[in-house]
Regions:
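Repeat-blade elements of multi-bladed beta-propeller folds
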Residues: 1-11, 38-70, 103-130, 134-136, ...
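Extracytoplasmic/lumenal domain signature
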Residues: 14-35, 39, 47-49, 53-55, ...
Length: 233
């Protein structure tokens, strides 16, 4: 952005680098839990400029995944956490997932920002068990960090806003990779995997089979399904 490169490291550090000189302007360490069951990877981060007057503290922010299933917002100029986002700059992505064993859910891909939404899924540990955490995709307010919608294939309706004590459907297909979007259409495109475990599907439910191995397009603002194309039946 402008004269600054923003990068993330395998340990979830975020650094701002002067694009001309290569000097580090600032770096931030979120003190991520990097235990033995966590992949040390970060595929990217996102930039968001808040509408005028929406945030005096962090008008420009970097929103990045943290290995231990958190999402953080940092001031793009200083690297300090945005206090108005979630809990002092962080939101926990394990909320609404029920019991999550260590290393069973984390995010390595950049969140997608479109239509004033921060949209992210997550990686679910393959081939470990059934009754694993949900693969639902969620959208958050980029200023406050509050959840706006969740796309949960096992829920009726599939798009809903979970409350503090709600749990998203377990064992559903996840979309852990890099998303793409079309701002003109207001759509976000998700590549889905399979419901866990990866290599046996005899127990899978009809909604698992329908949404596995698919390209999904959702209305970024509302989370409503707009397109579903299954690549493998």
């Amino acid at each position: 952005m402008d004269d600054t490169l923003y990068v993330c490291t395998g340990h979830s550090w975020v650094e701002a680098i002067d694009a001309a000189t290569g000097k580090i302007k600032w770096k931030y360490d979120p003190k991520a839990n990097t235990g033995p069951d966590v992949y040390l990877a970060c595929r990217g981060l996102a930039y968001y400029k808040a509408p005028e007057g929406a945030s005096s503290e962090c008008p420009e922010r970097i929103i990045a995944p943290v290995l231990d299933a958190r999402l953080m917002a940092l001031n793009a100029k200083t690297g300090k956490p945005c206090e108005d986002f979630g809990d002092h700059g962080f939101i926990s992505l394990t909320q609404y997932l029920g019991h999550v064993p260590d290393g069973f859910h984390f995010v390595t891909s950049p969140p997608m920002i479109i239509s004033d939404r921060v949209i992210t899924g997550g990686w679910i540990f393959d081939n470990q068990a059934t009754f694993e955490p949900s693969g639902a995709v969620r959208a958050f307010d980029p200023v406050t960090g509050k959840i706006v919608w969740a796309w949960d294939v096992g829920h009726n309706p599939q798009t809903w806003t979970p409350g503090p004590n709600d749990e998203l459907t377990r064992d559903t297909p996840n979309a852990w990779g890099v998303y793409t979007a079309d701002p003109k259409l207001g759509l976000v495109y998700l590549p889905t995997g399979n419901a866990p475990p990866a290599y046996f599907g005899g127990h899978r439910r009809p909604f698992d089979d329908k949404s596995s191995s698919s390209i999904i397009a959702l209305d970024a603002k509302t989370g409503e399904l707009r397109l579903h194309f299954q690549t493998v039946h």
